[in-house]
């Protein structure tokens, strides 16, 4: 095997030797041995492991590319870990919040009478308002819708937005004649009431002005949104039914007692303090002098 694959025998002849013409037997033997030589050479090449395979499992630097393979592997692992951590710590997308335009395009509520876009009303308040205005509509044929929004971007105040809602929901005078709209803007702490001619006449300007100036803004300032909506509904329903006005919200006198003393109390305390200090000074001078006088008298 070594004789067949030796470089000296395969590549160059011996020095000083002359090339002789090959005999037919030698040519035949040479031609017959060359295929075997090529087969053995190919077999030996197949047995050598490729350098890529060695570099793939060696990490000690014994073969070329081992250290680089481990470094690349660590870089990919760290990048994947960082990406996973960033995804896990990313805040969840906030749920979509309806806007004033969604309220306009949504149309009037068919059965609830309340569009709580601001999300400040409880289920109890919605149920009480629904029961109150549904009974009012069945008896007086006057419908009142209540709307709460967080803020306004298209209109300057709640009154313009209320008029816009009335025109959008009830385009004709016949449709909006007996309809009322109550709007409460939580961020601006203000409210507005508008409606068709029949609604305004049934409620009266005095109750409308009083409700807008007392119930809605005052209670909204204290973030009592449920009370603001429900008391407004009660006052409007009472006015339409011709009942006595329940009135606006009652205010408690939360006057706090001051910790500061009045002028009279200060003068009185000052006189007492002067008397005490003067007495202590007299005692401090008189007692030692009396003791000294008694001591001298004994001598």
Swiss-Prot record:
Biased composition annotated in UniProt, kind: Low complexity: 1-14, 22-36
| Highest taxon, organism lineage | Eukaryota
The UniProt transmembrane annotation reads 276-296
Region annotated Disordered sits at 1-60, 244-265
Major localisation: plastid
- This protein's species is Oryza sativa subsp. indica (Rice)
Give the transit peptide, as a residue range: 1-41, 42-98
Q: What is this protein called?
A: UPF0603 protein OsI_019212, chloroplastic
Q: Identify the keywords attached in UniProt to this record, alphabetized.
A: Chloroplast, Membrane, Plastid, Thylakoid, Transit peptide, Transmembrane, Transmembrane helix
**InterPro entries assigned:** TPM_dom (IPR007621)
The entry's localization annotation reads:
Plastid, Chloroplast thylakoid membrane
Q: Does the keyword Transport apply?
A: no
- Point to the regions of Basic and acidic residues compositional bias: 252-265
* Family in the record: Belongs to the UPF0603 family.
């Amino acid at each position: 095997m070594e004789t067949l694959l030796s470089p000296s025998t395969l590549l160059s002849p011996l020095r000083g030797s002359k090339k002789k013409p090959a005999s037919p037997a030698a040519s035949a033997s040479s031609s017959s041995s060359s295929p075997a030589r090529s087969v053995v050479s190919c077999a030996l090449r197949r047995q050598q492991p490729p350098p890529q395979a060695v570099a793939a499992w060696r990490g000690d630097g014994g073969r070329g590319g081992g250290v680089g393979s481990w470094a690349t592997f660590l870089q990919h692992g760290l990048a994947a870990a960082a990406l996973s951590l960033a995804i896990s710590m990313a805040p969840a997308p906030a749920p979509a919040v309806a806007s004033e335009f969604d309220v306009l395009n949504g149309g009037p509520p068919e059965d609830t009478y309340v569009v709580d876009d601001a999300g400040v009303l409880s289920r109890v308040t919605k149920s009480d308002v629904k029961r109150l205005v549904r009974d009012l509509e069945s008896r007086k044929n006057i419908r009142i819708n209540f709307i709460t929004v967080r803020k306004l971007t298209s209109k300057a105040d709640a009154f313009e937005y209320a008029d816009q809602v009335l025109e959008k929901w009830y385009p004709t005078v016949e449709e909006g004649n007996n309809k009322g709209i109550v709007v409460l803007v939580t961020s601006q702490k203000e409210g507005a009431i508008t409606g068709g001619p029949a609604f305004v006449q049934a409620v009266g300007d005095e109750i409308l002005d009083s409700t807008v100036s007392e119930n809605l803004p005052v209670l909204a300032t204290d973030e009592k949104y449920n009370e603001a909506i429900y008391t407004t509904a009660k006052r409007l329903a009472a006015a339409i039914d011709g009942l006595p006005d329940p009135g606006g919200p009652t205010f408690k006198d939360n006057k706090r007692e001051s910790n500061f003393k009045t002028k009279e109390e200060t003068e009185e305390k000052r006189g007492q303090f002067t008397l005490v200090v003067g007495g202590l000074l007299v005692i401090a001078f008189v007692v030692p002098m009396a003791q000294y006088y008694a001591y001298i008298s004994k001598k």
